[in-house]
Every structure is written in structure tokens, then in C-alpha cells.
Amino acid sequence: MDASALKSKTDDSSRKFIYTTAFLAALLPEYIAPLLTLAGFVVFKRRYSLTSQKVRLGTVGKVFLAFMCYSLLSSLWSLTPLYSAAISLLWMGMLLGSFMVSNLVVKKSQLETLVTAFSLGGGAVGGIGLLQYVVLMLKGHILNPLWGFFDKIIYELMPFDITYTATVWEKSRAASTFDNPLICATYLIMILPIAVYGFISGEKKHRRLCGISAVLILGGIAGTTSRGAALAVTASLVVLLFINSKKALSIFVTILASAGIFILGIVKRNEILEFDLEKSTDSRLKMWEACFKSISERPLIGFGAGCESTAQRMAEFGVRRPHAHSLYIEMASELGILGLLFLFVVFGFIIYDIIKLIKLGDGWGKLGIAFLAIFIGFAVISLTEFTLQTPKELQYFMLVLGMLEATKRMAIENKTEYGKERKELLKEKTPKEYTPV
């Protein structure tokens, strides 16, 4: 088999892993889903080596990897060194998915297939969540989270003690295939703009599937009855208004309908739990107060990667929670102000790439708006939730980053090729200089 045939076979088999992971991982338990990324990368790297190809790393990937190295270094001063090292290595492992996507998705058709895979996976998760919520509202019984009983067994077998305990029976909010409703909401918020893009601007044969998936995703988010998720999805949908002016009205109606569903869901949840907004806010404030006291004791470098160190510190101040319920406060607690600033640098490069993609215009600009909606939704929900906590959250965040890098490369190459073709065309049309005989 010649080099080009081997390369084609290599890329095709590795891409199947990407599509499978994008669709299936969200439906699997937290301790199984990451294996898809790791197995896919092993196949990808091994076959890449056979063809003497080099893995290209984008700027975001390089900076993020540097951040993770700092995170791993924090295990030297961590309150929970083994846990910190394990969490840092998990982040690095999931980053491999980003490299795989950005190197293998090199054509628009492949990108559209990936969009569909993400959308269908999100639709399945949202559909399960919506079903759970409806059954709970009807006072019925249903597995919620879907893998809760297995989660409890697995977490008890961990080689180190952890504060987090698996939720076996969530009585009022949908968790779908995730550990709890807030983690589910974070995932769905990342996938919603992709599904909306697929419905509005994707391949015609997949638009209906993406549209149905988007509706199910919204239903799943509503089923979590999370106020933070409601705010995040609203911000995300507002950005998506700019993706297509002809369909802006339908998106606006969707925003209003979603707002109504969220309000009804939250009111119903409060009735069931006798749990009001004031009590919820007070709980968050107590957590954050404990975290700020902790951060003030070691402001620069924190207490080590992983939320277990934060949980231990909060417990010392009389607050028993598994993490800070805010990505930004959690990072400051784990890795100090230096780590938080490092994370903001990573986010800065992500925003730069998104803006660059939007400026390239054409169909690429629409995808850029979808990525902007993802990032804004993620940034908003991160204010009140620790959004990079679990393996699946990390896995999908990295896969989406890989998709952004792949899209940016394709857009730049497409623009460059168009520029070359235009120059050649202009050269042909320029009248040749008359040379007298």
C-alpha cells in the first residue's frame, strides 16, 4: 500500500473514532466516556507515525497544555497530591481529543458530519433529560441520573477519599446521563449552538435532524431547572440571532418560549423542594466566603489542582460542599491568582480565534458566531457553576476547541486558495503588453 493510500485509510479510521466520540461519549458514564478519546488518539497517533505525519498543535492547544503543566506542578504543594496529579493528567488526556479533531477534520463535509454527530448526541441527552423531568413532574419513578447506581459503586472504589458522593436519585431535576443536573446543563449549553448552526446552515439532509436535536436540547436544559443555565442559554441564543437574519425571528420566539418553560420549571422545583431563591443565594455566598478566606491564605499558587483541595478547605470553615460552584473562584482556590490569570490567557486566545473566524465571513463567519455563542454561554454558566469538573465536561470542551481550530485552519486555507485563484484570474484578464515586430 503506497503512502497516500495508507494516509487515507489512517485518517478515515481515526475520523470514525471522532464522530463516534462526539455522539456517544455523552451517553456513557463519566468513567467510561473518556476512554473513547484516549483509544481514538492511540489509533490516530500510531497510524500517523506509520505515515511519518506530524501532529499540528494550534496556539490555543499549546497555551492550554502549558496551563495543564502548571496544574500538574501544583501537585508538589497540593493538600491532595495524588488527586491533583490525577486531575491534571485527566485534563491532558482530554486535550488529546482536541489535537485529534484539529488534525483530522480537514474538509467542510467532514466538519458537517461532526456537527451532526454533536447535535444528535446532544439531542439524545436532552431527550432523556426531558423524559426524566416529565415523569418526575407526574410523580412517577425513573432512573435519574441514568447511571446513578453504577456511579455510587465506582466512586466508592476510588483509591483515594473524595468529598463528592454520587447522586443516586435526583427527585426534582433532570440529570439525564450525567452525574447531576448542573453538569448536564453545562454539556447541553456547549452543544446547543452547534445544533442550531446545523439546523440553519448545515447540510440540507441533516438540517431536520439538527433542528429536532436543538429542540430536545432546550427541553433537556429546561428539565435541569437551573437558573444559571437559564441565563446562559438566553445569552447564547441572543448571540445566535446574528447567525441568520432570515431566521432571527424564529430564534427570538424560541428564546421567549424557553424563558417561559424555565420560569415554570423553576417555580415548580421550588414548590417541590420548598427551596426559595434566597436560600439558594445564601448557600452560594457562604461557599464563596469560605473560598475567599481560603484563597487569602495562599493567594498566588493556591492549594493544588482538583476540587478536593477546595472541598477540604471549605470544610475547615464549616461549609461542606464538593467545590466552589464557580469555575473562576474554583481556579483561584486550586491554582491561585497565577492559575486564574493563566486560564484567562487561554480564554483570550480562544476569543481571538473566534473573532478571526467571524471576520473571515462567508459560511465560516456563521460557524464563528456559533462558537461565540458556545463560549459566551459557557462563560456565563461558569459564574455560578464549576464547569470543568468532570471527565465528560472536559472531554466535550476539548473536542469543541479542536473543532474551532479545525474550522479556523480550513477557513484560512480556503481564503488563501481563493486569493491565489483570483490573482491568477486577474493576471489572465490583464492585456498583454504590445510588442512591435
Give residue ranges: language-model regions.
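A conserved mid-to-late transmembrane alpha helix and its immediate loop/hinge
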Residues: S176, N180, L218, E289, ...
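Membrane helix-loop boundary segments at the extracytoplasmic
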Residues: T21-Y31, S74, A332-L335, K366-A406
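Membrane-embedded alpha-helical segments of multi-pass membrane proteins
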Residues: L28-R47, S88-G97, C184-L192, A230-V238, ...
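A membrane-periplasm/extracellular boundary helix in multi-pass inner-membrane enzymes
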Residues: L76, G127, L131-K139, I221-T224, ...
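Hydrophobic transmembrane alpha-helices and their immediate junctions
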Residues: R46-Y48, F199, H206-C210, T234-L237, ...
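Alpha-helical transmembrane segments of multi-pass inner-membrane proteins
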Residues: T21-A22, A39-F41, L72, L96, ...
